[in-house]
Amino acid sequence: MNQPTILKTVSVLTLSGFLLAACNTAQEQEPVDPDPIETVTAPEPGEDDTDTEETIDETDTLSQNMLDWLPMNEDTAYTYSGTGSEFAEYQTYPQFIHNDTLQFVETNASTETVTIYEYTENEVREVFTRAETYFRDDFVDTGLNSSEQDQLEILLQAPVEIGRSWESPSGSVSEITDANVEVETPTGTYSALEITRTLNDQSDKLYYAKGTGLIQTISDVDGEAEIVSSLSNIQEDAAEEIPITLYELNEMATALTPTNATMELRTNDPARLQLTELLNGSTGDMTIPTLTENVEINYLYLGNDQIAHVDFSEELINDMNAGSGIEALLIQSLVNTIGGFYEVDEVLLTVEEAPYASGHIALEEGQTMSVDLSNVE
């Protein structure tokens, strides 16, 4: 082979090699995306997504209805057993329920305290509290002042979600610290909302179950003493029992005799109606009734002046067929009974909103009568 032929052959082979190499390179290299996008694949049904589910359960499914967490249950007594203090055991009973208020009495080993909750769409707060209250008045109607205005608490505030916090007039700070907490009580196991309230050196954990209300309280004082109160009994169709001392004429109509009786009042029952029945003999507690069956008590309440106010129907005078001595004893028996019920010394007794005035006794406008036990045998 001559030299030109050899060069021609080499040139053809070299060009073929370049073409083959170029073809192979084009087939092996993938195109490069200059701006890659990360693809997130949604979890398949059944895959574990615990964090997301817990977030949904604890926020989106929590009721925002205040009545779900602090319900108004008529004629229902709640009893709480406890450890760590003699005051850990107590009972609550709803005395009066209005559209936006709940008045209830809490009874423990030491005292009876009446509290009023006010409900709005966004919160439940205390608006009234009075310790040492052994009688029943509808304080929303009578307007009696709260004895501890600077100690009132906000119970719950929307939105109901973990992390929500608020400050109460008492100075305490409350926070929703957990939800769907499993809480065991003598009445059963509940899924509860946990609210932590702190004030000075005391921390309270309050647990509320939907539809039931407060089921448990755990109080930690100075990090040393733990006081626990747990719901131990729910009694429906119950009545509140309030003891009262009645004063009636003795058999000779010369003095007054004390008789112990008990009022049984349900939710929204005013005390005046049952007191009327006690005094007119309908209940059988009095041997000699003070009132006739025609007499009605128009109103009865304790005023901010610490005077018991009572107004009778006109039959109190019209049916008073007695001499001056017996009439005086009968009126004194009313004053002693009503004054004792409210634990006050003065009673303002009126008839149809006018001063009591009969042929034997005539009171002046605004004149009160004093509780007097000197004629009690």
Where are these regions (language model features)?
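C-terminal motif of bacterial Sec signal peptides marking the signal peptidase cleavage site
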Residues: 19-22
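Residues at structural and domain junctions
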Residues: 9, 60-61, 149, 173, ...
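Generic detector of well-ordered alpha-helical segments enriched in charged/polar residues
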Residues: 7, 67, 79, 272-280
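Bimodal "functional hotspot" detector
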Residues: 24-56, 162, 223-377
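Bacterial N-terminal signal peptides that target proteins for export
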Residues: 2-10
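Conserved functional acidic sites
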Residues: 36-37, 44-240
